Amino acid sequence: MKQLLQNLRTGEATVAEVPVPIVQPGRVLVRTAASLISAGTERALTELGQKNLLGKARERPELIGKVWEKVKTEGISQALEGVRDKLDQSHAVGYSAAGVVIETSPDVTEFRAGDRVACAGTDYASHAEIISVPRNLCVRLPDALSFEAAAFGTVGAIALQGVRLAEPTLGESVVVIGLGLVGQLTVQLLKANGCRVFGVDIDEARIQLARELGAEGGCVPASAKEQILAWSRGRGADACIITAATATNEPIELAGEISRLKGRVVAVGLVGMNVPRNVYYQRELTLKVSLSYGPGRHDPEYEEHGHDYPLAYVRWTEGRNIEAFLDLIASAQINVKQLVTHRFPIEDAPSAYKLISGSTNEKYLAVLLTYDVDGEVGRQVENPVVTKKAAAAAGRVGIGLIGAGGYAQKMLLPNFKAAGVEFCSIASASGVSARDVGTKYGFAHFVSDAQSVIADEQANLIVIATRHGSHAALTVQALDRGKHVFVEKPLALNDAELDCVIAAAERSAGELLVGFNRRFSPLAARAKEVFQHRQAPLSIVYRVNAGRIPREHWTQNPNEGGGRIIGEVCHFIDLMQFLTGAAPTSVFAQAVGGGQGNVISEDSVFINLQFADGSNGVIAYLAEGDASLQKEHIEIYGEGKTFVIEDFRSARLYAGGREKKESLRQQDKGQADETRLACAVVAEGKPAPITLAELEATTRATFRIRDSLRTGQPMEVMIQSPKSKVQSPKSN
C-alpha cells in the first residue's frame, strides 16, 4: 500500500510502498478515504529534519544526556552511528483521517466492516491507504457527513478541547490569538457556543476569513490592545485562546494585556511560555495549557488498551470530543469546506509537503490528501534489489525477523550481517519499520504479519524481537514448523506459556535459542576460566543500577512486558547459572519498599538464589540510583579469589594478594558471539549453546521471584524438561 513517510535526518517526504498493517488486538483496520495535513505539526517536523545535527540537538536538548551516556559505554563512534541510524529512519506522519472499516479485531464489537469512521492519533491515523487504529480513537460518522469533512475530526477536537478549558459562557467576549486552521475552527466553536469572538493574526486574509466565519472583529497584534479594549466595552476579554504557533513570547504577553481582571487564558498552540508574572498576578489570570484532543491523550490504557473513561466522571474524552465536533459539522454549525485550500492525491503528497514547508509563496490553510478507495493494495512488499533465492539449503542461514525495533536494529541485525547470513523476510506490525529496516539490510520480503515470516521457506532461523507478550506464542508456532528459533528474552511470561514452549521445543526438529547474551561476553568467559578448576561453591554479588521505568511503559504492563523481573532479571540469573554451572534451586526476594506515585516497589529488589552445587547469588536490582553510576557490577568469590566485572567493559582479578586489571576497548555484553554461535547451530548442526533445561531454569526462577515477593517466603525452582540437563561444575 502507499504511505507518506518522512525522513527525520533530511526532512524529506516520500510516498513509499509498505506492507498493509495487521489487525492487532483492540484495533480496527480502516481503508482511508481522506486525511488532513496538520500544517503546524507536520511543518515543524520538516523544519527539524532540515537542520544539521547540532541544530537538532538544540531543538531536542533532552536527548544530549542520553547520547553522552552511550558515548561513555559504547564509545563515540558507535554512539554517533546510533544517532545517525535513528535519524535516518522513516516516520509515519499524519494523525487525522477518515475512511471505511474493512476488518476488526475479534475483541472489537462496537465496529464492523463497512462502518464509516473518523480516526485519530499519531502512528495510527497516518497518511496511508490502510491504517490500523485503536478502538477508542475511532468514531462512527453521522450519516450525511463526507469523508473530507470527517478528516477534520482530530484537528477539530484540538480546537474543541481548548474551548472547553476556557469554559466560555453564553455572551462572553473571547479572543482567539492565531487564526490558522485550529484558530479558524476555534472561532466557529465559540460562535456556536453563543460567544462574541475577536480574532488576532499577522495575516489580514486570515482575519477576513475569521470575520466571514463568525468573528465580530479582528486585527493584527500591533493594534490589538486598543481595538479589543473598545470591542469589549472597556472590560477586556473574558477569555483568550492562543492557537498561534511561534517560539516567541508575544502571544502569551498579549493575552495578559487584553484580559480582564480574573480572566482565563488557554494555550493550545506551541508558543513561548515565559509568563509575564506582573500582569498575570495583578489581574489574577488563570492560565491553562490544553492537552491535544482531550482526556485520554498519551494514556496507553485509553489509547492502546481500549479502556474508556466512565462518561459520568469524564464526560469529554478525546474520542467523545471528536464525536461532538463531527456532530457540529453535520448540523452545519461548523464550516470546514471554506477552510480547504488544497487537495492532493496520496501519490502527490510530497507536493503538499513542499507547500506547507514554505518553499513556495503560495498561501494555504487546510490541505487534504485523497485516496482511491477501490484500488488494489498488496499486503507484502518485495525488495526489487534482492534476487529471489531457492528454498533454504544445508549450510546456509536464512533469517526471518519478526519485530524491527531498536534492539533488533542496533544489536541483532549488525551481528547477524557480520556472520554472513541471508536476510529473507521481515515483519513489523505497522509495516513502516519492516520496509525501512528491510531495505537497509537487504531483506527479500517486507510484511506486517508474523505468520508470513514463519512460513517463508527460505528462512530457517526465525528471530523473534517483538514485545515480550508475544514471544512464547510465536516461538511455539515457529518450532512447530520445524524452524530454528532465536527469541529475545524473556522466553515466556508465565508457567503456562513456558510449558507450551518446552513441549514445542522437545517435539521440534528445530533448536531453541534465547537472547541471554551476557554469558557470551569475553569477561564472563574470563571469569569462568578463573574458577574452572574449583571444588567449592561460588558466591556472586550482582548489583544492577537499573534506573526508573514509568508505570505506563509497555514493559511494566503484565500482558505486554511482564514487568522488569521477568523481562530483565532473567539476564542476571542466566549469567549466574553459567558461572556456577548449576541450576537455581530456590529463590527468596524482598522489595526495597512500597512504591509511591510513579515508582513500582518491585523495580527495586534484593534477590537471594541458591544453586544445585551449593553456590549462592545475590542480585541487587535497584531502580532509584543515579544514571552516572555504571549499570552492572559483579563480584565473584571462590577459593581465595575474587573476580570483579565492571559493566562488561573492564575487570579485576584479586588472587595471591595481587590485583590484575584488564579492559576491553568498548563494552561487550556478548551479542556478537551469541549470534555467531546461533548461526553455527543452524549452519553446522552444532548443539544449542544454552541447553533447554538451562533456559527453563532461568525462566522459572523469575516466576518464583515474583511468587516470593507476593508471599514473603522462599520458593523452590522446579525444572520439568527431561530433554537436557544443566552441566555440573566438575564437567567445566
Show where each model-derived region lies:
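Mid-domain Rossmann-like dinucleotide-binding core that forms the NAD(H)/NADP(H) cofactor-binding site
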Residues: 116, 123, 148-223
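C-terminal helix-rich "cap/oligomerization" subdomain common to oxidoreductases
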Residues: 354-365, 369-370, 375-392, 461, ...
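Beta-strand-loop-alpha-helix segment that lines the small-molecule cofactor/substrate pocket
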Residues: 260-261, 472-516
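Predominantly a Rossmann-like dinucleotide-binding segment in NAD(P)-dependent oxidoreductases
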Residues: 285, 295-313, 329, 511, ...
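Rossmann-fold NAD(P)-binding glycine/threonine-rich loop
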Residues: 268-286, 290, 296, 491-511
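Contiguous beta-strand/loop segments that form the cofactor/metal-binding neighborhood of enzyme cores
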Residues: 351-354, 359-373, 377-381, 567, ...
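N-terminal Rossmann-like dinucleotide-binding module
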Residues: 378-441, 461
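Glycine-rich beta-strand-centered segment in the early N-terminal region that forms part
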Residues: 21-37, 45-122, 683
